[in-house]
Amino acid sequence: MFEKTNRMNLLFDFYQELLTTKQKAYVSFYYLDDYSLGEIAEEFEVSRQAIYDNIKRTEESLEKYEEKLGMLKKYQQREKLFSQLEAQLTKKNFLDEQVKDTLEQLKNID
């Protein structure tokens, strides 16, 4: 469950602008704020089943966006390469503060 929550949070970060206002709210409450389905249903005055169905559809949408656009996959690949580069530079004593700052800037472009 923890892995799924992390994945959904990351997908939400990348693709939330493609979701409806309602989808954003439900997913945000459920995954980011850790509300239960019942708490969200009470907040929006709808049934628990309606919240569940909407969240499941939204999860499917987020996965489809990732399948087509691959933003999360590319992000994870870049992070892995940055870590490898940092380790290689450290090993060869080439990692000074200026290089560290440049690597950080590259990481934060997205």
Swiss-Prot record:
SUPFAM superfamilies: Sigma3 and sigma4 domains of RNA polymerase sigma factors (SSF88659). Might take part in the signal recognition particle (SRP) pathway. This is inferred from the conservation of its genetic proximity to ftsY/ffh. May be a regulatory protein. This is UPF0122 protein Lm4b_01818. InterPro entries: RNA_pol_sigma_r3/r4-like (IPR013324), UPF0122 (IPR007394), UPF0122_fam_protein (IPR054831), WH-like_DNA-bd_sf (IPR036388). Gene3D superfamilies: Winged helix-like DNA-binding domain superfamily/Winged helix DNA-binding domain. Belongs to the UPF0122 family. It comes from the Bacteria.
